[in-house]
Swiss-Prot record:
It is found in: Cell membrane; Golgi apparatus membrane. SMART domains: TRP_N. It is a multi-pass membrane protein. The keyword Nuclease does not apply. GO terms for cellular component: cleavage furrow; division septum; endoplasmic reticulum; Golgi membrane; medial membrane band; membrane; plasma membrane; plasma membrane of cell tip. Residues 689-710 are annotated as: Disordered. Pfam families: TRP, TRP_N. Interacts with rho1. This is TRP-like ion channel pkd2.
Length: 710
């Protein structure tokens, strides 16, 4: 048991999981050099150097500006995972060209060389683990002193990589196809097929997608985190619309410049850009202002990128094009939804031209077309709210150009207004139906087909008692986006905020359990728990309080391992659950609308109707109050399945079902499989029959138990 008490040994054991990397070519490299003292007399405009331990050779391409013209000694300090290696080098003993003595002016070195002697002994002291651990987090600091007076002349610093990373382009695209494409398909189908099974599938897909977005948000934080966390988040940047396409980047650069902004050129400069990616909170150089993010060859210019700037550069996207890239793919998704809506109507119309009973079917299409098309757009806006809120907050904070800043403000306000409108319309439907305390008011909310097609995504996945719960979740998303976008200059605040938000969400999920089924509550509680653990790790690693560097790196590896395992389990579990729901023989009893029919409420209501006349009871009994709203659409009348008649003369009279949704749900499964044996629910308008049988208790909908899914 002593093995696990040592963080260093634990780190070694975890790293052995990546032993497959030994089969690849081993090397370490550095591609940037920044100054670490004021008035440093040595700087670099270009640096690329790699060491290959297998053949003991080094390849380099260096351009250095020197103001030193004397003999010097070089102190080398290598720091990785809390371990430090220090060496003192005499350039004359090692016969380094241009350094014995050092010469003023530009020093250009390029080529390859096989190392021997002291230089080889220094590099051989590097542990073999440095060549295999993914996302190596190592820093090399070089201090140059005058040999005679021991006066410090220069200080430069570089980060070291080994080519191993948990980010892979293949993983990036596989995750995009596995998570994004199924979500898009079910999202576009959901306004058309209003079945409880589809509601459950869409909600689980959205949950998986939002978990992927959270992973991307971690990599966009300016908080000083281990490099492995940033690389892991890069695998999910597609969920934020960050997909690099060459010609689009050229268009965005032109647009930024033409609208008064100064486009960044870091990616275009390539190896000629002396860019340092911030690691472990070390200030590797002065952070250039956004409006003047360019690279020069002066002795003090070097650029350090953090947070969104860092991830943008790593994804090959200019920092000034970050918002435009994400926004463009959101617009493409909206346009694709429009094409799907238009194509679907065209195809259906063509099919109906050759079918019988054309008048009735055409009337259905025309009746529902507006609701279905609006449902497409509202669902895309709902799913893209996290993406666009973060990108808009970032653009408002940075103001790459006046046009982009205005566009970002318009987009976030427009999306927020549309989602608020959907929520308000839901509240209005409830208020028109009756008081909230009425047993059937919330049941009717789930039977208005046109409302379901447009705004059902706001509440169909929830327990009817918490139909409003999507709205506070959107507010939490907006607050999180503000901390990510506006908090790029306050990394510690970002880390604390992410932890606080995860605590709030976890508490809400555990205490309220707001979703309609036990399975969905379990899923969301599990995701919230994983986000809480991740938030706790970020709080530890954000340097809000002192933590040993080795401990931070171990926590970073554990963070990656837990989130990777959770993502794998979510993908497998959700897809297995989707198959079960789709191919289940009977949908009966799988997705009830649970009302908060407390015993006192049901008792008092039943007592109040005893004094009513039989005719009054026909309109007031909860068994006969109907399954649709007034002036809404009823899917379940056999004589006119898509009618738009007034429901004041319609009542639900299926004796075999406990609640309206029992019949609707089972009928939907029967229709999908062509099973005619299942009795279709129907509406009856003959109140004489109802009055004659108003004492039949079996014909009334009984209150569902409070703990049906608890």
């Amino acid at each position: 048991m002593r093995l696990w008490r040592s963080p260093l040994l634990l780190l070694v054991v975890v790293v052995e999981l990546f032993s497959w990397a030994d089969a690849l070519t081993r090397f370490i490299s550095a591609d940037s050099l920044s100054t670490c003292m004021t008035d440093s007399q040595l700087s670099a405009s270009k640096l690329y150097a790699s060491y290959f331990p297998d053949n003991q050779s080094v390849a380099f391409d260096i351009s250095i500006q020197s103001l030193v013209s004397t003999n010097v000694s070089i102190d080398v300090d290598i720091s990785a995972y809390g371990i430090e290696i220090k060496k003192v080098i005499d350039p004359c003993d090692m016969e380094i060209s241009g350094f014995c003595p050092m010469q003023t002016g530009n020093i250009a070195l390029s080529g390859s060389h096989t190392l021997t002697g002291e230089a080889l002994s220094i590099l051989d002291s590097i542990p073999s683990i440095a060549y295999t651990v993914p996302d190596l987090d190592a820093v090399v600091t070089i201090n140059i002193y005058e040999s005679d007076t021991n006066t410090q002349l220069a200080c430069v610093r570089t980060t070291v990589q080994n080519g191993r990373s948990v980010y892979h382009r293949a993983v990036y695209w596989v995750m995009c196809m596995v998570i994004g494409i199924p979500l898009l398909i079910f999202l576009l189908i959901s306004p058309v097929l209003q079945t409880p099974a589809l509601w459950e599938i869409v909600e689980t897909m959205i949950t998986l997608f939002q978990f992927a977005q959270i992973q991307a948000l971690y990599s966009m934080m300016a908080t000083s985190l281990p490099a492995i966390i940033y690389s892991w988040g890069r695998n999910f940047m597609w969920s934020m619309g960050i997909i690099r396409i060459g010609f689009m980047q050229d268009v965005f650069t032109w647009y930024v410049k033409s609208t008064g902004g100064t486009p960044s050129t870091l990616v275009d400069l390539g190896i000629h850009a002396n860019v340092a990616l911030a690691k472990r909170g070390i200030d590797l150089g002065s952070l250039a202002k956004r409006a003047t993010t360019t690279v020069t060859t002066s002795t003090s210019d070097s650029i350090t990128l953090r947070g969104i700037k860092r991830i943008s550069y790593m994804m090959g996207i200019e920092t000034t094009n970050f918002f435009a890239t994400g926004f463009s793919f959101f617009i493409i998704l909206l346009f694709f939804s429009l094409l799907v809506a238009m194509a679907s109507r065209f195809i259906v119309e063509m099919v109906l031209l050759a079918s019988r009973n054309q008048a009735l079917k055409k009337q259905r299409i025309r009746l529902y077309w507006k609701s279905i098309s609006k449902g497409f757009f509202y669902r895309v806006i709902f799913v893209g709210f996290t993406q666009m809120s973060v990108l808009s907050m970032w653009e408002i904070y940075t103001r790459d150009s006046s046009a982009l800043a205005f566009l970002s403000m318009y987009v976030i306000v427009d999306m927020a207004v549309l989602l608020c409108y959907a929520f308000v319309r839901t509240i209005q439907i409830i208020r028109k139906t009756g008081p909230y305390s009425h047993p059937d008011v919330l049941y009717n909310l789930y039977s208005d087909t046109q409302h379901l097609m447009r705004w059902g995504f706001m509440y169909v996945q929830l327990d009817v008692r918490f139909f409003y719960f999507t709205f506070p979740l959107l507010l939490i998303t907006l607050v999180r986006s503000m901390f990510i976008g506006f908090g790029q200059g306050s990394p510690k605040v970002q880390g604390c905020a992410m932890f606080g938000i995860s605590v709030v969400v976890f508490a809400l999920m555990v205490i309220l359990r707001p979703y309609a089924t036990k399975h969905m509550n379990t899923l969301h509680i599990g995701v919230a728990l994983m986000n809480l653990i991740s938030g706790s790790f970020i709080l530890v690693m954000c340097q809000a309080f002192y933590v040993e560097e080795l401990a931070r790196q171990v926590i970073g590896i554990i963070f990656f391992a837990l989130n990777a395992i959770t993502m794998l389990l979510l993908i497998l579990g959700i897809f297995i659950r989707t198959l079960i729901v789709l191919f289940r023989k009977s949908g009966h009893g799988t997705y009830y609308r649970i009302l908060d029919d407390q015993s006192e409420k049901a008792t008092s209501y039943n007592k109040s109707i005893k004094d009513m006349s039989s005719s009054d009871m026909a309109f007031s009994d909860p068994a006969y109050s109907g399954t649709t709203l007034r002036s809404s659409v009823d899917l379940n009348t056999p004589e006119y399945p898509f009618s738009n008649r007034n429901d004041s003369d319609s009542t639900f009279t299926n004796n075999k079902y406990v609640s309206p949704w029992d019949a609707i749900e089972e009928a939907s499964y029967a229709n999908l499989r062509g099973n005619t044996d299942v009795e279709q629910p129907f509406m009856e308008s003959d109140y004489t029959r109802i009055s004659e049988n108003n004492n039949n208790a079996e014909r009334r909908r009984k209150p569902l138990p409070n703990n049906a899914f608890r």
